[in-house]
Amino acid sequence: MSKVIGIDLGTTNSCVSVYERGESKIIPNKEGKNTTPSVVAFTDKGEILVGDSAKRQAVTNPEKTIYSIKRIMGLMMNEKNAQEAKKRLPYKIVDRNGACAVEIAGKVYTPQEISAKVLMKLKEDAESYLGEKVVDAVITVPAYFNDSQRKATKEAGTIAGLNVLRIINEPTAAALAYGLDKKESERIVVYDLGGGTFDVTVLETGDSVVEVLATGGNAFLGGDDFDNKLIDYLLSEFKNESGIDIKGDVMAMQRLKEAAENAKKELSSAMETTVNLPFITADQTGPKHLMKTISRAKFEGMIDNLVGETISTLNSVVSDAGLKMSDIKEVVMVGGSTRVPLVCEEVKKAFGKDLNKSVNPDEVVAVGAAVQGAVIKGDVKDVLLLDVTPLSLGIETLGGIMTKLIDKGTTIPTKKSQVFSTAEDNQSAVTINVLQGEREFARDNKSLGNFNLDGIMPAPRGVPQIEVEFDIDANGILTVSAKDKATGKATDIKITGSSGLSDEEIDKMVKDAELHKEDDKKRKESVDARNGADAIAHQTEKTLNEMGEKIPADLRAKIEAALNDLKAVLKDENATKEQIDAKVSALSKTAEEMYKAASAGKNAGGTAGGNGNAGSNGNSGAKKDDDVIDAEVE
């Protein structure tokens, strides 16, 4: 049976794990690192780079380097967070059927497609590590992700060629990794602050049960926002000093982003750091340099309100669970942004106790996802995971009211139904508008989709009985159905449109991904062939020069001709592996004659050396006589 991998698909970095021989292990990527940057780049040569290689070239290719794609996953263009992302991110965010997408060199990609490229790399790294094909996966999402964001994440997995067995919440996965071996029941809080999202979850763990009591968060708050505070400060300071606004310079902004991220990390251990960006821009007076020293206190002042938001959410979630802060035994810190000292200080202050830092904040979520995969496969038995829906679900009713069918915090999977009626006499159809959120009016909540129930028998208003049923699966993904109880006529909708992709589009993207996979493989083979050919050409040229006149003129001419043919094909960027291999083969054949000539020369030199050695022996004999004479003198 093939193994199940657990994937933490993060805003900034991603991580993959597998459950083997009774424990979850992090799978290193091909670069030897435990985490992979969630970055995808498109080069001018048509290459697609993923991970570290994509991140390294971001400064020189900012408009075609995609990072933080998770921030617009499943978002519609008219949402506030989408507009904020559009202002902040250097690449082009466009409208695709109402949903967010990115445009690179005239081609539109959905967030699902970009995320799929990261997932494909993680999948390939796992296959390389395990030595077998990997299909099944458990992927994590922020607890506060809505239905469309969860659906989009699952679609990304499908496009990447994965069978997504389960979508689980990141804090729940962390708790699963932390609490699996806990025998005594204890209430814990998982405070998860990552690169782009924030979640806090109250759970009860013990005796192989992990039960979510309450959850909350912000799907648009994380380390990126800390970076943005630093960026805004540096932009303002530079403008005040130089009079130049570099906000519109994408390359300068990318340099600034990387510098801000590094400054944030340095301030986690140092009391101050210096941002030094020479030649950031220029005007008629010459080049301009950005240099600014930032203290930890200054940085903490910038992010204080953001950290305060997380503490406010923390208080609300503990209250929603019906608990007091003193009821919490452990506070588990998850996510790279929990390394910021102010974050730890404020959370510690809220609980009045030391924080649990026993888990690796970058890896624990993937570890828990792998445990969940093992539970689904039956490799880990008697573990029960009870998760909850993060937001209430309902429909729009008369007067634009949101009528809730499933309250937030309901354990999933779950199914709830309620009977409604018509608003007008002889109404023959109703439109069901499915909503998610906590506000009283439909317009203030997120619409996940709508569908019609036709063929209702004519009757006075209030008489027809229409049963609406909500069914949430273990992934937190919703299906809604409506039935006219008089006629038995029914219709349903799996909320798929909310992610912006139809089943046909997903199928096409899966095929496109497979097609690109083959193209990438061919391109890599071509690069490997070029590298090998270049090494052979260099070695042949070196040997030619070293041997000089020892190579017969006619043989030298043949080798040089074959060498020039190979160099010519290497200059052609469109040359195929087969064309390169053919020229390498031709050069190798002629070079063999050269190496034979070189070998013959060495053998001849060996014979001469033998005679020389005999002569030397004679000299040695003479020297020996001299030695004897010297001895006699003594």
Curated annotation (Swiss-Prot):
Stimuli inducing this protein: By stress conditions e.g. heat shock.
Keyword hit for Phosphoprotein: yes
Molecular functions (GO terms): ATP binding; ATP-dependent protein folding chaperone; unfolded protein binding
Region: Disordered, residue numbers: 515-536, 595-634
Ranges of Gly residues composition bias in the record: 603-615
Biased composition range(s): Basic and acidic residues: 515-528
Chain positions found as Phosphothreonine: T197
Entry keywords, A to Z: ATP-binding, Chaperone, Nucleotide-binding, Phosphoprotein, Stress response
Keyword Phosphoprotein applies: yes
Stated family: Belongs to the heat shock protein 70 family.
PANTHER family for this protein: HEAT SHOCK PROTEIN 70KDA
Record HAMAP family: DnaK
UniProt function note: Acts as a chaperone.
Protein name: Chaperone protein DnaK
Record organism: Campylobacter hominis (strain ATCC BAA-381 / DSM 21671 / CCUG 45161 / LMG 19568 / NCTC 13146 / CH001A)
Gene: dnaK
